[in-house]
Amino acid sequence: MYGNIDGHPLRVMLPKTLIFNVEGVEVLLTHIGGYPGKYAPGIIQQLRSNNTRLFISGHSHILKVMNDNTLKLLHINPGAAGIYGFHKVRTLIRFCIDNCRIYD
C-alpha cells in the first residue's frame, strides 16, 4: 500500500488499503486512518464492512496501541522506524497472531 509521500508511479501500482486475514483475524492496513474516536473519513465504514479486528495505520509517526471497544478491534500505529522525519525515536511493534488471538 502507498503513503502520502509516495508519488504517482507507486500509487498506480499499489492499493491505498490492504485487507487480509491472518490466523482468523481480519486486518485492515492503511497509511492515513486516524485512531479510535478520531478516524479518517470513510475508515469506520471499511472497518465495519470487513469485520476488522486489527486496524493498522500510521501517518502521525506517533506510537499508539489502543482498543476500540465500540468496533471491537485493536488499533496499532507503529510510529516511525525511518531515519528521516521529525521523530526523535525510531519505533516499531512486534506482536503475535495465533488462532484468532492477538497478543504479546
Q: What name fits each language-model region?
A:
Residues 3, 31, 59, 79, ...:
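Divalent metal-coordination and catalytic microenvironments
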Residues 17-20, 64-67, 91-95:
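Short beta-strand scaffold segments in enzyme catalytic cores
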Residues 1-24:
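Core catalytic region of metal-dependent phosphoesterases/phosphodiesterases
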Residues 5-11, 34-39, 56-68, 82-87:
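Active-site environment of divalent metal-dependent phosphoester hydrolases
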Residues 25-33, 73-79:
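Active-site-proximal beta-strand elements of phosphoester/diester hydrolases
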Residues 27, 53-54:
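Short, Asp-centered acidic motifs that coordinate Mg2+ and/or phosphate
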Residues 29, 34-48:
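Pre-active-site segment of Zn-dependent metallo-hydrolases
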Residues 22-23, 45, 50-52, 76-104:
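Binuclear metal-dependent phosphoesterase catalytic core
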